[in-house]
């Protein structure tokens, strides 16, 4: 009968293409059982990758069958997403494991489109995902997610999130008329956002994606200090002026102790739909160079494509409108890279410890 060591040695030859590590070293192999010629085990991933389950299973079965004496192999691939650490001194959010801020130093770089497609990509890969539209002066997620109406409240205090495409969504856009301007000062806007965040009944989320307001002003700084953020994704175009403002966003998150999960370069190249000629309208590799300069992960580049805009405007973003297309595949790859970076962070164990209260009477 084959031994466990023989089997693990064979399985260690299979590399996870997302992490570059084998499944044995990463301690992903669980519940290994050998009964004569039959083998069964689980593979537990720390990030969502449902579209790759079949490929993982096939590679692992082939490796296991390479061991003499093994005839039948059963592999069950699962995902277990853990809570990870946030800034010190910030109150955690119940039922939300990880909060990811999608930010940009300036408007118009495609931050909201990136945020909604990242949320949908994580969901498509098997995660439970929420989306908070924190762009209080220009909320766009209700339109992009194709959601109308107002959120309901069972107890008169907390709101139930709106939902579409399997994503839980909250936005100030659900609470005001579509053409109403939010003429609010910073403190009022920040308070409203905190209420949206903490008075929404989020239900067992692996990830809450926050579509941050553009810029690095008072609202962004206050949110970064008060919201328990696992990490931030910076969206930029290759254009020099966009990169200049993106660097300011990086500095802001660094000052408040929020790690940068990576850089997304949007509108990186335009491919003519008539002749196929590719042109770098906003410059070339600016986001990639910035990521290298700051020693940050370069999560990926997206094209300047009219379909991305049309699909978002029609309330069916690219990942749901064309799930098997090239652009959706890029969004899914970016989402996986981001989730892997989150999984590599220190886990949050605060819920494992009792709260210690000190009073004058003790």
Regions inferred by a protein language model and the residue ranges of each:
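Phosphate-binding loop that captures ATP/GTP phosphates
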Residues: 122-184, 190-198
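C-terminal boundary of histidine-terminating zinc-finger modules
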Residues: 314-325
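Conserved catalytic-core segment of NTP-binding enzymes
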Residues: 90, 206-207, 213-314
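Extreme N-terminal, non-catalytic leader segments
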Residues: 25-28, 35-103, 335, 339-342, ...
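N-proximal, solvent-exposed amphipathic alpha-helical segments enriched in charged/polar residues
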Residues: 1-30
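Walker A/P-loop phosphate-binding motif and the immediately C-terminal alpha-helix
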Residues: 99-136, 250
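Glycine-rich phosphate-binding loops of nucleotide-dependent enzymes
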Residues: 170, 212, 225, 333
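Short glycine/serine/threonine-rich phosphate/pyrophosphate-binding segments
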Residues: 108-118, 139-140, 212-220, 242-245
